[in-house]
Regions:
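Short, conserved non-catalytic motifs in the polymerase core
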Residues: 21-29, 54-80, 94-106, 126, ...
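Reverse-transcriptase-like RNA-dependent polymerase core
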Residues: 10-11, 42-65, 78, 85, ...
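Short helix-capping/linker segments at secondary-structure and domain boundaries
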Residues: 88-94
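Conserved polymerase palm-domain catalytic core
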Residues: 38, 44-46, 97-98, 103, ...
């Protein structure tokens, strides 16, 4: 049900998830000043399918190496959390047990502890960073996976908006 998926209550949950660890950021603070009206505006835009991702924030980090980061504005991050809340339970059922990246109650430290139990104590491992990982994801293949496993036109629409959004076309340098 579209009104349920994009409801104020679901957006409020997504907002609370999104602001964890982000409350001190400028875009989060601006959003929080009028968060109820911002969420109502988002609800209306999503239900009417008038939602458009806003500007991104572009900045460089140097640790562990120099790299360019394209971050979504806080308002768009709320929408991302809304979409993840719908997709996550579907993907969780398909993942193998020993897949640890970006999963609730898992993560790199838990993966290392598990690996230490499974193999010899003289353990070596590699933690790698794939250059331009998110930029090189095949967006059409990703969207096809969603279409294959999700039977909800509203989710298709929102996923397409987010996946095919190009942050380099509308950004604020920082």
């Amino acid at each position: 049900n579209v009104s349920m998926m994009f409801s104020f209550q679901n957006l409020l949950k997504a907002y609370y998830q999104c602001r964890k660890g982000k409350r001190k950021t400028t875009s989060a603070a601006k959003f929080e000043i009028n968060f109820e009206s911002e969420l109502l505006k988002l609800e209306k835009e999503l239900i009417s399918r008038n939602y458009q991702p806003g500007h991104s924030i572009c900045f460089a980090i140097t640790d562990p190496k120099l790299r360019e980061v394209w971050a979504a504005d806080f308002r768009d991050r709320v929408v991302h959390h809304l979409l993840v809340s719908y997709l996550e339970p579907i993907w969780e059922k398909m993942f193998v047990f020993h897949s640890y990246a970006c999963r609730q109650t898992k993560g790199a430290h838990k993966a290392i502890r598990c690996l230490k139990k499974i193999i010899a104590p003289d353990l070596f491992f590699l933690q790698a960073d794939i250059q331009s990982f998110f930029v090189t994801i095949d967006k059409s293949a990703l969207f096809s996976l969603i279409k294959k496993h999700v039977n909800n036109p509203e989710i298709f629409w929102l996923a397409e908006k987010i996946i095919f959004h190009d942050p380099t076309t509308n950004y604020i340098p920082r």
